[in-house]
């Protein structure tokens, strides 16, 4: 079984960066930094990808390098009101509470056919314009991804581009394994971030 990962303290955590290592499974919730094994990220980025993972949940993350400054990428990522700008699996989106710019606002998303879902009601959890962090959770809808929560961060790369990190936590659906759940969600997230890279470069 693929194990979640936790922040590894000690000699590997130096110069403001953290190296992430696997953590043994436990029976209760545990705070885990859900990033790819061996990934080096700034400490202020890693802290945003910490989730309370229960025994029937899984978490993972996907990283995308984009050859554009963070401000250009953020202009698309921040659009809680219009995720279709780079998420191709979304057929329609409408704000049902608020204006899409404040924590607590809700959106209703309709997905394209062919996916094991019809709709999703999502709540904006974080919108940090200064640090380039956005997070949403799924609070309703017709789908199988119960208790899904996503966090996306942007930080500058050494070559004046952008590193996008998106992590998530979700319940493992009944009848599915952790590996199957991670494979499915990772694929969706990866496709979205690849589309984000293409959309940013077209600006």
From Swiss-Prot:
Site label Involved in ABA binding, positions: 185
Primary site of residence: cytoplasm
Annotated abscisate binding sites: 87, 117-122, 144-150, 166
Region START-like, residue ranges: 51-201
PANTHER family (UniProt xref): ABSCISIC ACID RECEPTOR PYL5 (PTHR31213:SF183), OS08G0374000 PROTEIN-RELATED (PTHR31213)
Function statement: Receptor for abscisic acid (ABA) required for ABA-mediated responses such as stomatal closure and germination inhibition. Inhibits the activity of group-A protein phosphatases type 2C (PP2Cs) in an ABA-independent manner but more efficiently when activated by ABA. Confers enhanced sensitivity to ABA. Can be activated by both (-)-ABA and (+)-ABA.
Protein's UniProt name: Abscisic acid receptor PYL5
Organism: Arabidopsis thaliana
């Amino acid at each position: 079984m693929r194990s979640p990962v936790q922040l590894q303290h000690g000699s590997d955590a130096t110069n403001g960066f953290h190296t992430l290592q696997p953590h043994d499974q436990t029976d209760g919730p545990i705070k885990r930094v859900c990033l790819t094994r061996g990934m080096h990220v700034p400490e202020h980025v890693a802290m945003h990808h910490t989730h309370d993972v229960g025994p029937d949940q899984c978490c993972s993350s996907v990283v995308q390098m984009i050859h554009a400054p963070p401000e250009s990428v953020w202009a698309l990522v921040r659009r809680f009101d219009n995720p279709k700008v780079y998420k191709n699996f979304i057929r329609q989106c409408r704000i049902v509470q608020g204006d899409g710019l404040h924590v607590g606002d809700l959106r209703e998303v309709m997905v394209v056919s062919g996916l094991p879902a019809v709709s999703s009601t999502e709540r904006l959890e974080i919108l940090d314009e200064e640090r380039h962090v956005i997070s949403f959770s799924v609070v309703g809808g017709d789908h199988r991804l119960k208790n899904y929560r996503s966090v996306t961060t942007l930080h500058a790369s050494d070559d004046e581009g952008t590193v996008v990190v998106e992590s998530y936590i979700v319940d493992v659906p009944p009848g599915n394994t952790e590996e199957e759940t991670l494979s499915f969600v990772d694929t969706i997230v990866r496709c979205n971030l690849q589309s984000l890279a293409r959309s940013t470069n077209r600006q």
